[in-house]
Amino acid sequence: MHVSNFTAGLLLLVIAFGGTSIILKHKVERLETSVTEITKTANENALALNNLRIQYNYIDAMNNKNREAIAAIERENEKLRKDAKKADVVAHKPGLVEKQINNSFNKFAEDIQDLSK
């Protein structure tokens, strides 16, 4: 049985295309698997990023709340320092303190009378 050069060439060409198609099919399957894995990883990373964003917002809110609390404490400390300086005045001038209290009470009483008119 004699095979012509054309037939042999055609047969080699068919075998080459068949082999190439098998190789390409395996590559496509591996790429599909890779795409699936990458998509899964991307979704997991997106979820983790969203969780981090939620945690950051919570920490930021707590940080702002702490700043406000610290500012309030500092204001109160400053007031206490000023009041502590007045302790000597109160001890040495009780009449002045009594006069200030009476003035404040009189002003309060006048305000009440004005409101009741």
From Swiss-Prot:
It is a single-pass type II membrane protein. It is found in: Host cell inner membrane. Residues 24-93 form a coiled coil. GO terms for biological process: viral release from host cell by cytolysis. It comes from the Viruses. Keywords: Coiled coil, Cytolysis, Host cell inner membrane, Host cell lysis by virus, Host cell membrane, Host membrane, Membrane, Signal-anchor, Transmembrane, Transmembrane helix, Viral release from host cell. Residues 24-117 are periplasmic. The chain crosses the membrane at residues 3-23. Residues 1-2 are cytoplasmic. GO terms for cellular component: host cell plasma membrane; membrane. Interacts (via C-terminus) with the spanin outer lipoprotein subunit (via C-terminus). Part of the spanin complex which spans the entire periplasmic space. The spanin complex is composed of spanin inner membrane subunit and spanin outer membrane subunit. Component of the spanin complex that disrupts the host outer membrane and participates in cell lysis during virus exit. The spanin complex conducts the final step in host lysis by disrupting the outer membrane after holin and endolysin action have permeabilized the inner membrane and degraded the host peptidoglycans. Host outer membrane disruption is possibly due to local fusion between the inner and outer membrane performed by the spanin complex. This is Spanin, inner membrane subunit. It comes from Enterobacteria phage T4. The gene is y13K.
